[in-house]
């Protein structure tokens, strides 16, 4: 069996409220465990609308049919009214995910804020964002948070340095090919990174593949992956608008010798065996703006 890390990003209030119960039921049915990363603070995702002025983001929204894919309430959240606090109202679903045997970590306090402002926040502001997120998630889970994955893969060496204070077992902050130990700004070795290696639905539909062909496309990408495959889904997509399509994918992979697992299951017993690398800012196909990407050293 080819082991593939399955990462579930939970970005929004509605994605938590509606997408989590759907995915928990589907994963239980197919006997799958995954790593869930929750946004826990205010849902301000509608404030991304200003990015429509950027041609690359506008094209991404058009080709993925974003209004249908996400729903208008998600696209407008936190614009004309204050964003709802996700963990405050829906923390029980985060605990339910943990109790179902899945790995649970922090995605963000304010997902939209992190994507839009991380590059200009001070070190103190970055620290506060992570701290608020950790505290809210720990309150919901009633146990320490041991892993994290920053919103939108917006991470660089400065972000990694800030996150060292929280002593996570691993982070999944970047795109790349295989787990590694990041070299930090001060020359020290940071917390293990488990990069996402495979494209997400919204990165390739409308450019590389048609919607109806996506499942076979991602299976082919998994088979071609020569590193340590990690696949990201979103509750707002695979847990809602594309739930039926995603369940078809799970049925297909059962016949392809592919097994999904939590990200921590991809790590060796001795993490000192992992190679070193860096996380650097880079453009990425299908995404607007910079992402954190793995670089060999």
From Swiss-Prot:
Family: Belongs to the polysaccharide deacetylase family. ArnD deformylase subfamily.
Record EC number: 3.5.1.n3
All residue ranges annotated as the NodB homology domain in the record: 2-261
Keyword Cell membrane (UniProt): no
Pathway of action: Glycolipid biosynthesis; 4-amino-4-deoxy-alpha-L-arabinose undecaprenyl phosphate biosynthesis; 4-amino-4-deoxy-alpha-L-arabinose undecaprenyl phosphate from UDP-4-deoxy-4-formamido-beta-L-arabinose and undecaprenyl phosphate: step 2/2; Bacterial outer membrane biogenesis; lipopolysaccharide biosynthesis
Encoding gene per record: arnD
PANTHER family to which the protein is assigned, alphabetical: 4-DEOXY-4-FORMAMIDO-L-ARABINOSE-PHOSPHOUNDECAPRENOL DEFORMYLASE ARND-RELATED, GLYCOSYL TRANSFERASE-RELATED
Keywords: Antibiotic resistance, Hydrolase, Lipid A biosynthesis, Lipid biosynthesis, Lipid metabolism, Lipopolysaccharide biosynthesis
Keyword Lipid metabolism on entry: yes
The name this protein goes by in its record: Probable 4-deoxy-4-formamido-L-arabinose-phosphoundecaprenol deformylase ArnD
Domain of life: Bacteria
This protein's GO CC annotations: membrane
GO molecular function, one term: hydrolase activity, acting on carbon-nitrogen (but not peptide) bonds, in linear amides
Chain's role: Catalyzes the deformylation of 4-deoxy-4-formamido-L-arabinose-phosphoundecaprenol to 4-amino-4-deoxy-L-arabinose-phosphoundecaprenol. The modified arabinose is attached to lipid A and is required for resistance to polymyxin and cationic antimicrobial peptides.
CDD domains: CE4_ArnD
Organism of origin: Proteus mirabilis (strain HI4320)
Swiss-Prot/TrEMBL GO biological process terms: 4-amino-4-deoxy-alpha-L-arabinopyranosyl undecaprenyl phosphate biosynthetic process; lipid A biosynthetic process; lipopolysaccharide biosynthetic process; response to antibiotic
Enzymatic reactions: 4-deoxy-4-formamido-alpha-L-arabinopyranosyl di-trans,octa-cis-undecaprenyl phosphate + H2O = 4-amino-4-deoxy-alpha-L-arabinopyranosyl di-trans,octa-cis-undecaprenyl phosphate + formate
InterPro entries: ArnD, Glyco_hydro/deAcase_b/a-brl, NODB_dom, Polysacc_deacetylase_ArnD
